């Protein structure tokens, strides 16, 4: 009988994280839904996951806090018996021009988006080493490859995630653990919905496929990297951006 595998998705109460959690559930994973703010939204995702016939629970943790992350990993293993897939999706923005950016704006984004990924990988690794298997998928961004004005802090973290992914992949490969990154381009969200038609048209001119991506495009890519079909892929960054960056 095939054993059910388990996954932890950080920042999974909404947006891309929610879509990833639901897709992994569709693939048969038990899924822990991490959140930082809204317990209500996280619990709603849990109910959607359970409706697919797998187990799920919501767990609050600030990924920038190593102790909270350690406790979260321990709880996931306690409830599910294993941790087979870690998806580092949690992230924030504090946009500002470089000359005007406050130190706190820089630190907040670095702590969540880069240190948070490090914390989760470091605390999840002992369990995966014991299992001699695991898949870690980190969310980067197209801007980590091309840069973006007004987002020096965010861009630095997303470029850093790519480097961290490569280093972790080299360290963990001998133990059967893969580490990859997914770098979304412009994805339909509340942010893109609020943009003017003129600005949307301007953004679309940068995308050869001439459309914005859907969060399911990202979720499907993550699910593939988490699967046995991707066992010979590690240290890679998969760009899902409609050709915006090649």
From Swiss-Prot:
It is an enzyme of class 1 (oxidoreductase). SUPFAM superfamilies: NAD(P)-binding Rossmann-fold domains. Transmembrane segments: none annotated. One of its GO terms (molecular function) is NAD binding. Substrate binds at residue 141. Pathway: Lipid metabolism; fatty acid biosynthesis. NADP(+) binds at residues 11-14, 62-63, 89, 154-158, 187. The active site is at 154 (proton acceptor). Belongs to the short-chain dehydrogenases/reductases (SDR) family. Homotetramer. PANTHER family: 3-OXOACYL-(ACYL-CARRIER-PROTEIN) REDUCTASE (PTHR42879), 3-OXOACYL-[ACYL-CARRIER-PROTEIN] REDUCTASE FABG (PTHR42879:SF2). This is 3-oxoacyl-[acyl-carrier-protein] reductase FabG.
């Amino acid at each position: 009988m095939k054993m059910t595998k388990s996954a932890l998705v950080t920042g999974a109460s909404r947006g891309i994280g929610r879509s990833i959690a639901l897709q992994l559930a569709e693939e048969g994973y038990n899924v822990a839904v991490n959140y930082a703010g809204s317990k209500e939204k996280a619990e709603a995702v849990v109910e959607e996951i359970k409706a697919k016939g797998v187990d799920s629970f919501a767990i609050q943790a600030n990924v920038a806090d190593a102790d909270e992350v350690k406790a979260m990993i321990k709880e996931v293993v306690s409830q599910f018996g294993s941790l087979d897939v870690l998806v580092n999706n949690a992230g924030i923005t504090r946009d500002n021009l470089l000359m005007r950016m406050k130190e706190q704006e820089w630190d907040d984004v670095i702590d969540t988006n880069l240190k948070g990924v490090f914390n989760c990988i470091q605390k999840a690794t002992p369990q995966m080493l014991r299992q001699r298997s695991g898949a870690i998928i980190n969310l980067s961004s197209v801007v980590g490859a091309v840069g973006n004005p007004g987002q020096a802090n965010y861009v630095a973290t997303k470029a850093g995630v790519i480097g961290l992914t490569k280093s972790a992949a080299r360290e963990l490969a001998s133990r059967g653990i893969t580490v990859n990154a997914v770098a979304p381009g412009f994805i339909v969200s509340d942010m893109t919905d609020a943009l003017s038609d003129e600005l949307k048209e301007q953004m679309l001119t940068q995308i050869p496929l001439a459309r914005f991506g859907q969060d399911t495009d990202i979720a499907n890519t993550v699910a593939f990297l988490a699967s046995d079909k991707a066992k010979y892929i590690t240290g890679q960054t998969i760009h899902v951006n409609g050709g915006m960056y090649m």
